[in-house]
């Protein structure tokens, strides 16, 4: 039986920008073990070399290192790229991927200056928005049993009817663990920076259209108005049940909590305001991650 997913499936061919770096080396190995079709990498200074890894079956494979994203796409047919380059080089790496018109770009890198991200996003828009960007500062995306583009542990759970979109990486893992017996179509960590590519709304819209996703779980956090905007969208566009959690109920005003985007100003951006907006849109909101998982389980089993 083939399971559907959103944005990423077993058919995607993946390249890694910065494949020779230490973090990229570790996660390339993990992605290959998870079944991801990694077809090569990019590092202009090491173009023409190869890196050796084990595939899912434990066989040694040599992955080619290319000088550019465009060349990698041309030679391998890649349609997904993952960025593992340091923050100072991230803007150029993102621009290069946009110029090559890669359909999906996952930016793992943490600590990219917000003005660099904002510049790259404007550039993508100007270029006709041919590239979907997930991140930055995120764990990426996993369609369990199919493919992993990012750093989410692949062995937590298998395929199933839950679609998950989260601002928090660690809460993504916790939610997958709590509902591991039920499984997930796709889980996306969208990142907690003030400027991100794929939003809650983008993911929720895709889950609504995905025939194999029966229930949507969204994890937000204090700061900004993304959750309020998602609530408005859900109200008019989503027929599937949605369960939510908002991290940061105990946050003091004006203090950044873990993510640069997680900051409360006045009554806007508080967890209570977000919970209220979501509940008004028919979303069941849990008080804790575990309570949220319990709500999801209860609703899913009653469908």
Curated annotation (Swiss-Prot):
Gene3D superfamilies: NAD(P)-binding Rossmann-like Domain, Succinyl-CoA synthetase domains
Cellular-component GO terms for this entry: cytosol; succinate-CoA ligase complex (ADP-forming)
Active site per the UniProt annotation: 259 (tele-phosphohistidine intermediate)
Chain sites annotated for binding CoA: 20-23, 46, 108-110
Pathway involvement of the protein, from the record: Carbohydrate metabolism; tricarboxylic acid cycle; succinate from succinyl-CoA (ligase route): step 1/1
Family classification: Belongs to the succinate/malate CoA ligase alpha subunit family.
Protein name stated in the entry: Succinate--CoA ligase [ADP-forming] subunit alpha
Organism: Mycobacterium bovis (strain ATCC BAA-935 / AF2122/97)
Gene responsible for this protein: sucD
């Amino acid at each position: 039986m083939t399971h559907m997913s959103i944005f990423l499936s077993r058919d995607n061919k993946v390249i890694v920008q910065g494949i020779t770096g230490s973090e990229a080396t570790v996660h390339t190995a993990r992605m290959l073990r998870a079944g991801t079709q990694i077809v090569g990498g990019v590092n202009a200074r090491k173009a023409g070399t190869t890196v050796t890894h084990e595939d899912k079956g434990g066989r040694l494979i040599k992955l080619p290192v290319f000088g550019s994203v465009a060349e990698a796409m041309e030679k391998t047919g890649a349609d997904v790229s993952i960025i593992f380059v340091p923050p100072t080089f991230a803007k150029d790496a993102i621009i290069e991927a946009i110029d090559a018109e890669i359909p999906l770009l996952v930016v793992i890198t943490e600590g990219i200056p917000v003005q660099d991200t904002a510049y790259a996003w404007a550039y993508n828009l100007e270029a006709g928005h041919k590239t979907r960007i997930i991140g930055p500062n995120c764990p990426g995306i996993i369609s369990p049993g199919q493919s992993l583009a990012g750093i989410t542990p692949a062995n937590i759970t298998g395929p199933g009817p839950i679609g998950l979109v989260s601002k928090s990486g660690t809460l993504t893992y916790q939610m997958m663990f709590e509902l591991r017996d039920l499984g997930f179509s796709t889980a996306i960590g969208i990142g907690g920076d003030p400027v991100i590519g794929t939003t809650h709304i983008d993911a929720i819209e895709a889950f609504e259209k995905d025939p194999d996703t029966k229930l949507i779980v969204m994890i937000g956090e204090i700061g900004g108005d993304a959750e309020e905007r998602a609530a408005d969208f859900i109200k008019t566009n989503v027929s599937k049940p949605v369960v939510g959690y908002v991290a940061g109920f105990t946050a003091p005003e004006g203090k950044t909590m873990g993510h640069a985007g997680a900051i409360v100003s006045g009554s806007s951006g508080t967890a209570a305001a977000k919970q209220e907006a979501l509940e008004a849109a028919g979303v069941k909101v849990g008080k804790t991650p575990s309570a949220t998982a319990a709500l999801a389980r209860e609703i899913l089993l009653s469908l």
